[in-house]
Amino acid sequence: MRQLAKDINAFLNEVILQAENQHEILIGHCTSEVALTNTQEHILMLLSEESLTNSELARRLNVSQAAVTKAIKSLVKEGMLETSKDSKDARVIFYQLTDLARPIAEEHHHHHEHTLLTYEQVATQFTPNEQKVIQRFLTALVGEIK
């Protein structure tokens, strides 16, 4: 049991190292030639689905509005985002993708799908009962971490 605890600790430390300064962990590498942060790519992916405000993006990404503002300023400057004001309240600004950003957003979405597919492929190495145990373990561990 002690070795399992050590293995879990090593796994979590590796996750932290891989995730440092990133919003999420994705398997594989982006092939885009554009140097964007993971958060910026995720913003583009969210905006490919619908126009959103800074507050809505921050809530969906679970980051501060300041972090979103910083990421958005750079994306606007690079010509990847356009802004529009709310017709009812001109103080509210919505962001939407430009044609330049669409391929990057699509690639990030594909990267998400590849990551989920990889998790599914790893899970198939275990029986359905083992998968249930893994799920219970992960749920309990997340509960302890929070």
Curated annotation (Swiss-Prot):
Function: Zinc-responsive regulator that acts both as a repressor and as an activator by regulating directly the promoters of its target genes. In the presence of zinc, directly represses the expression of the adcRCBA operon, of genes coding for a group of surface antigen zinc-binding pneumococcal histidine triad proteins (PhtA, PhtB, PhtD and PhtE), and of adcAII. Can also activate expression of adh.
Complexes and interactors: Homodimer.
Entry binding sites for Zn(2+) 1: 24, 42, 108, 112
This protein's name: Transcriptional regulator AdcR
Residues within the DNA-binding region(s): 54-77
SMART domains named among the record's database cross-references: HTH_ARSR, HTH_MARR
Effect on the protein of changing residue 112 to Q: Strong decrease in zinc binding. Increases cellular zinc concentration
Pfam families in UniProt: MarR (PF01047)
GO molecular function per UniProt: DNA binding; DNA-binding transcription factor activity; zinc ion binding
Binding, Zn(2+) 2: 30, 41, 107
The organism of origin for this protein: Streptococcus pneumoniae serotype 2 (strain D39 / NCTC 7466)
Activity control summary: Zinc acts as a coregulator and is required for DNA-binding activity.
Other observations noted: The second zinc-binding site seems to play no significant role in the regulatory process. Its function is unknown.
Residue ranges constituting the HTH marR-type domain according to the UniProt record: 1-143
